[in-house]
C-alpha cells in the first residue's frame, strides 16, 4: 500500500475533467474513472475499485459525474 493517504477527486471543472490529488500533489486531470485508475496505478496503488474505495473522496459528484453542473 502506498503512503498517498486520501485521494481527492475534485468537482468537474467548467473546461472539463476533474483534478485528482493525493498527498498535496496533483496526480492529473481525469476525464473518466479509467483515468483515475491509471493515476493511482502510477502512484503505486494497483487494483483499486475507484467506484467503491474509501481511499477516494469524490467532490461535486461520484465516479459517474464528469461534466460540470448547471
Regions found by a protein language model. Name each.
Residues 1:
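N-terminal domain-start interaction segment
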Residues 4-26:
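N-terminal acidic leader/helix
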Residues 7, 15, 33, 51, ...:
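A generic structural micro-environment signature
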Residues 31-44:
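A short, charged, amphipathic alpha-helix used as a generic interaction element across diverse proteins
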Residues 42-70:
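Mixed-charge, Lys/Arg-enriched low-complexity segments
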